[in-house]
């Protein structure tokens, strides 16, 4: 039961972590474009 709970937490955190990294990189990319202008 504990293994199932841990696996569920990991599977739930992975997409959130990837989404957070993607959004952060996207915001930094747009900020760089604005500075170039």
From Swiss-Prot:
Record-level GO BP terms: cytochrome complex assembly; photosynthesis
Entry's Gene Ontology molecular function annotations: electron transporter, transferring electrons within cytochrome b6/f complex of photosystem II activity
Transmembrane segments: 5-25
Disulfide topology: none
Source organism, top-level taxon: Eukaryota
GO cellular component: chloroplast thylakoid membrane; cytochrome b6f complex
Pfam families, alphabetized: PetG
Keyword list, A-Z: Chloroplast, Electron transport, Membrane, Photosynthesis, Plastid, Thylakoid, Transmembrane, Transmembrane helix, Transport
Cross-referenced InterPro entries: Cyt_6/f_cplx_su5, Cyt_6/f_cplx_su5_sf
Record carries keyword Acetylation: no
Localisation: Plastid, Chloroplast thylakoid membrane
The protein's role, per its UniProt record: Component of the cytochrome b6-f complex, which mediates electron transfer between photosystem II (PSII) and photosystem I (PSI), cyclic electron flow around PSI, and state transitions. PetG is required for either the stability or assembly of the cytochrome b6-f complex.
Matches recorded under HAMAP family: Cytb6_f_PetG (MF_00432)
Family (UniProt): Belongs to the PetG family.
Assembly and binders: The 4 large subunits of the cytochrome b6-f complex are cytochrome b6, subunit IV (17 kDa polypeptide, PetD), cytochrome f and the Rieske protein, while the 4 small subunits are PetG, PetL, PetM and PetN. The complex functions as a dimer.
Descriptive protein name: Cytochrome b6-f complex subunit 5
Organism: Cryptomeria japonica
Gene name in the database record: petG
């Amino acid at each position: 039961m504990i293994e199932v709970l841990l696996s569920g937490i990991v599977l739930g955190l992975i997409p959130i972590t990837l989404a957070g990294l993607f959004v952060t990189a996207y915001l930094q990319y747009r900020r760089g474009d604005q500075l170039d202008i």
